C-alpha cells in the first residue's frame, strides 16, 4: 500500500464510545422481539439511527465517516472482513461497507447548523422542564383566587405597618441612656430571686432596647439597666402590653373581614381568636423583622433584642428569635403570609371550638390554596419543598405560642401588666 493511500483511522474511532447523542434515536420496545441488536456489529442497539437499528458506537462512526469524507481502504485488501463488536475497530472500511449495506443513509445525517438548532432546542426544553410547575399543578381556581384576594384586602385594611395610628401608648419611666431606675421600680425588683428564676425559666437572657423617632426628627432611646438578671424587662412591660394590644386588635379585625369566619357561630369565633391571635401577630411582626440587626422596624418605633453578654448569634438560642430568623429565610410573599395567618386562624383543635369539622374543612381549603399558589407562582423544582417548610413552621409556631403564653402568665401573676384584651386572650390557655 502506498503511503498516501494508507488509511489513518484514529480520528474515526478515538471518540466512538463517547459520541454525544445529537440525533435522538427512535426507541424500540423489547416486548415483542426481545433484545434488539445492532445490524452492523451485533452489539446491543438503542434505537434507529439513519434508517437502521444500530448501537451508539456504529451510529457515531457512520456519522463521522460521512461528514469527514475520508477514503477508507481495507488493510487486508479483501473487503470482506467480518464485523463484530470485538472486530469493528480493526477494519473501518469494511465497517463502513456494512453500514451502507445495512441501509444507513448519508442524507439522513443532520448538518452542523441543524445540529446546533437541535442542541439549542434540547437545552430550551430542559430549561422549560425545570421552570414548569410540578405534575398536577393546574394553577389557581377562581375560588382560590377569590380567597387570596379577600385575605389581601383584609390585610391591607387591618395591618398598619407604619404604626401611624399607634398613639397614647405608655413608655418606660426611664427613656434615655445611663440612668438609674426610679425607686418605685427598684422596689418592684426585690422579690425573692427564686420566684423570678421560676418566672423566667427556659428563657435566654436578653435585653430589649427601644428607639422612638419624633415627627420633628428627634430621637429618644431606652436602654435597659446594665445588670442582666432578667428583671430589666419589667419597666418595659406596660409599653409592650400596649404594642401587643394594638397588634391584637388588628388581627381580630383581620379575622372579621373574612366571610368564612363571620359565618361561624360567635362562640367558635371567640375560641379561634383566643387560640390564634398571638400566632398571627408573630407572623405579622416577622414581615417587619431585620435578620441582620435583630430589629423590628415599627414605624417611628424600633425594637431590638440584645444579648447582655454580647453577640447576636447567642440570641438564636431563644425559640422566638430562632423562629423569626428561620421564617425570614424563606423569603415569603405577602400572599403566603396572609394564607399562613388564615391557616393558623382556622385551627379546628383550638379549645372550645364546636364546629370542628367545618373549621377543619376551611383550614384545608386555605392550605390547598397556599399549595396551589406556590406551585403556580414559584419556580419548580427550586421551591418544591416550600409548602412543606411552611407547614412545619406553623407547627413550630403552635409550640412557641404555648411557651410564650405560659411565660407571660407567670409574669402577670407577680407583675400585672396585661391589658383587658390580653387577659381575655390569655384565658384561653386554661382550655
Swiss-Prot record:
It is found in: Nucleus. Its main location: nucleus. Residues 38-104 bind DNA. A zinc finger (NR C4-type) spans 38-58, 74-99. One of its GO terms (biological process) is positive regulation of DNA-templated transcription. The keyword Transcription regulation applies. One of its GO terms (cellular component) is nuclear body. GO terms for molecular function: DNA-binding transcription activator activity, RNA polymerase II-specific; nuclear receptor activity; nuclear receptor binding; RNA polymerase II cis-regulatory region sequence-specific DNA binding; RNA polymerase II transcription regulatory region sequence-specific DNA binding; sequence-specific double-stranded DNA binding; zinc ion binding. Nuclear receptor that binds and is activated by a variety of endogenous and xenobiotic compounds. Transcription factor that activates the transcription of multiple genes involved in the metabolism and secretion of potentially harmful xenobiotics, endogenous compounds and drugs. Response to specific ligands is species-specific, due to differences in the ligand-binding domain. Activated by naturally occurring steroids, such as pregnenolone and progesterone. Binds to a response element in the promoters of the CYP3A4 and ABCB1/MDR1 genes. Heterodimer with RXRA. Interacts with NCOA1. Interacts (via domain NR LBD) with CRY1 and CRY2 in a ligand-dependent manner. This is Nuclear receptor subfamily 1 group I member 2. The lineage of its organism: Eukaryota, Metazoa, Chordata, Craniata, Vertebrata. The gene is Nr1i2.
